[in-house]
Every structure is written in C-alpha cells, then in structure tokens.
Amino acid sequence: MREISCNAIISSIKEMCIQATHYLSDDMKSALYKGVEKEESPLGRQILEQLCENLTIAGKDMIPICQDTGMAVVFVEIGQEVHIVDGGLEDAINEGVRQGYIEGYLRKSVVSDPIERVNTQDNTPAIIHYSIVPGDRFRITLAPKGFGSENMSRVVMLKPADGIEGVKKVILETVDLAGPNACPPMVIGVGVGGDFEKCAIMAKHALTRAAGEHSSVPYVRALEEEMLDKVNRLGIGPGGLGGTVTAFAVNIETYPTHIAGLPVAVNICCHVNRHVTKEL
C-alpha cells in the first residue's frame, strides 16, 4: 500500500492551475506555430501571429493566456494500492484549485447554483472524473476549460443506422454551427459510443491528448485525419474571419455501446487548450 498525503495533492493542483493558465503545452504551441505556416489567408496568418505573440507576452509577464481561466476539470487515475492520508481526496483537489486561483490571481468563474448564479469566489468546485487502475499509480490531469467553446459543444443520440456517416455529419455540423463563437482555431474532442454521459466524458478527455497524436485504432485514426481535413475545408479560419486553419486536431475516443444506440459527443476547445498532467 502506497500512501499519498493530501498536502502533496493540494500543492500539486495549485501549481498546475497556475502553470496551465499561463503556459500552453508544447504540443499546442507547436500546432499554433505550424498553423501560421499552413494558413493561406493573409488575415488568418495575421491572427495566428497575434496569438503567438500573446503566448510570448503571457509567459514573459506571467499573466494568463486568456481572461477566461476556465472551470477546473480534473481527471484522476488512482491505483487500487494507493491510500490517501491526512484528509479526503476530493477536498484536497478543490483546496488546490482554490489556492491556485486565489494565489495566481485567476478569474473566478464558478457560480454555486446554475439558477441563482452566486459566485463561489474561489473557482470551486472542480469537475472531477475518477478512474481506478491497478497498482499504486496516482496521476492527475488538470484541464481548465473556458466556456466560449464549451457552449458550442453538443451531444447527439444517433440511431445505429446512421452509422459512421452520421458521426461525420454531427462533427461537421457542430463545428459549422459554432463558427467564430468557439474562438477558432480549435481542438475538437469527440466521444462515440457508451451512453449519454459516457460519450461526453470521452469527448472531454480526448481534448487532453497531445495535438497531432492520433488514435492507435486504425479506422479511428483515419476518421480523425478525414474529419480534420473536412473541418478545415469549412473555411471558418482563425477568429472566424475565413481561412484554411479552423482546427489543429480532431481527437476521437470510442467505447462499447447498446445495440439500439450510437451516442456522439463533440466537445470543442479554442486554441487555448490547457492541460497539465502530473504523477505523484
């Protein structure tokens, strides 16, 4: 049995909140710089260059990349042989988020009730997804999610007869409907299968995959490549002002489903696709 202290979790989450909101991961920076080279529209290139400059300023002056520093989404992989000590795991995660957003001077964007809309003043609670794995591994992925792109996301319950063409249609329709409102260029997470909530969680988790890293399943990889090409042919472009770089990646996850269903979720993220992973 391996023991992990809540204090270590709090400290890690706090640091991850500040890191994720001030610095893009290397894969996203690379995708952005490559986008400048690929973009055919002069205006589109200008917008991408401004986004690159914004990254530089954020890192140099230690200010957030975007004013929407997101709602904290946390994926936890915890081994069966791990014992959390000195407190509760969920309390520790939320305390880490609280400290990170307060000490990092990050925008507090969470309200305590969806109808009454009273701000919690510390960006808690986080949205936490747990996965129990063998052994004594403890891995945390933090993904602060902004809601400009979140509001453009969808879950569609297709019929099995809709097949792969139906899945393609949902992806393209979702991106097309989002247009400039998702702050393109974007990363598109897709979940196919499971049930209503499982496909949505997969779509969210797909956003944490490195840009340019494809599925290990051959047909899924082919679908990712095809959909990225089709999305970029929509011509939405950077900032929604036209161009050839609408998305950097389409990441798809799948799961077994019921014989009567074909659930599809599309979770869109803007170019500020923040994700940090740490093992304790």
Give the role of each language-model region.
Residues 1-190, 195-280:
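Non-transmembrane, aqueous-exposed alpha-helical and coiled segments at domain scale
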